[in-house]
Amino acid sequence: MVETTNKGYVCQIIGPVLDIEFPGGKLPPIYSAIKIETADGIGNIVEVQQLLGDNKVRAVSMRSTDGLKRGVEAVDLGAPITVPVGVPTLGRIFNVIGEPVDEQGDVVVDQTLPIHRDAPAFTELETKPSIFETGIKVVDLLAPYRRGGKIGLFGGAGVGKTVLIMELINNIAKAHGGVSVFGGVGERTREGNDLYEEMKESGVINSSNFAESKVALVYGQMNEPPGARMRVGLTALTMAEYFRDVNKQDVLLFIDNIFRFTQAGSEVSALLGRMPSAVGYQPTLATEMGALQERITSTTQGSITSIQAVYVPADDLTDPAPATTFAHLDATTVLSRNLAAKGIYPAVDPLDSTSTMLQPGIVSEVHYETAETVKETLQRYKELQDIIAILGIDELSEEDRLVVARARKVERFLSQPFFVAEIFTGSPGKYVSLEETIKGFTMILNGELDDLPEQSFYLVGNIDEAIAKAETLK
């Protein structure tokens, strides 16, 4: 029998970074996983980052290195970190190395995959841009998502990010027969727990039968070492790739927060002895970001559409971390505190949200024209708000008063009841097709509904519901 176990020992520990010495000629390659025995018997997984010479490798730990000593045995596992994939992962919470952490027992899977994989080859890519319909009016009309694209989600605390994420998970499952993977990267443990509980409440996770759940969760939270936060995005992505490539499904991949991925890389970079670049970030920033983002794409088999929450440090959009992220995004969804304060949910800002898909040739002509007219109407209303606040609406010209009346109807019609919010609002959720959305806004802008009260457009699905609601308000 061939001896497969390659053993070394820890010779230096610098925070989350360890140096390990192996016998001559038996160095594990870069990205290999190495298991280190710990006093609690659980063991610590570290990932090789550099080959130093003198039979030593430098590795980054996925768990806390507290209590580790020099001289402890390290076993080369002979492969990169591998994680479970497939239907058994749905409804469960995993850590960076694919261990379930929700106290619901072991996960039995037929297959595990390494977290470091090549992006799909050019020949496998789906090149024709197509819209990914979400059933959410404001998104589909004004900042449509690309199938297999990357969307940046911007918004402060309490403006409805979590509810929007859960609605998207719900809609992809119902309308596209797809699944979702949620990667919690370096965010608060409390938020991760709240999200899990809310998903169980809203039916996105079915705790009595996990196979009927619509999402798998992977968490590497703030309290974990930078190695875990740096790799947890790849763990989530690997699970999503399996659903795309093997199950041939449309997948939604959520990364909350993409900035923490970069931040973890910069924490490790200095300890690995790399020279820092601008603002102290790692010199490999663009490469690391590209390696993650290039794997998120549409193939001829299925698609991974990614929605990434983007934290902007000190609101500086020129900071290297958000600036590098923007280079990869196809669309942005900006949540507005002003709209949330008015009670308009989803609080997506119709003027600040953008999409590269909203151009003639990709969307239909009527879609493009309707979206542009909606934006013009809302922009004009925004410009007139100061005058209205000072002089009152009666001082406006007849034409401007009509614009304001229609803009207020448009603003309210951009709101929508969500399936996952039924338990809070008491009103049933609505999925609105793109066709219905365009029809509704065209009717408002053409003046066909000028005689209806603006309340009738608030929190309804399609335009027929608004007309029916107006009847009940009479």
From Swiss-Prot:
One of its GO terms (biological process) is proton motive force-driven mitochondrial ATP synthesis. It is a peripheral membrane protein. Its main location: plastid. It is an enzyme of class 7 (translocase). GO terms for molecular function: ATP binding; ATP hydrolysis activity; proton-transporting ATP synthase activity, rotational mechanism. It catalyses: ATP + H2O + 4 H(+)(in) = ADP + phosphate + 5 H(+)(out). The keyword GTP-binding does not apply. SUPFAM superfamilies: C-terminal domain of alpha and beta subunits of F1 ATP synthase, N-terminal domain of alpha and beta subunits of F1 ATP synthase, P-loop containing nucleoside triphosphate hydrolases. InterPro entries: AAA+_ATPase (IPR003593), ATP-synt_VA_C (IPR055190), ATP_synth_F1_bsu (IPR005722), ATPase_a/bsu_AS (IPR020003), ATPase_alpha/beta_chains (IPR050053), ATPase_F1/V1/A1_a/bsu_N (IPR004100), ATPase_F1/V1/A1_a/bsu_N_sf (IPR036121), ATPase_F1/V1/A1_a/bsu_nucl-bd (IPR000194). Produces ATP from ADP in the presence of a proton gradient across the membrane. The catalytic sites are hosted primarily by the beta subunits. NCBIfam families: atpD. This is ATP synthase subunit beta, chloroplastic. It comes from Thalassiosira pseudonana (Marine diatom). The lineage of its organism: Eukaryota, Sar, Stramenopiles, Ochrophyta, Bacillariophyta.
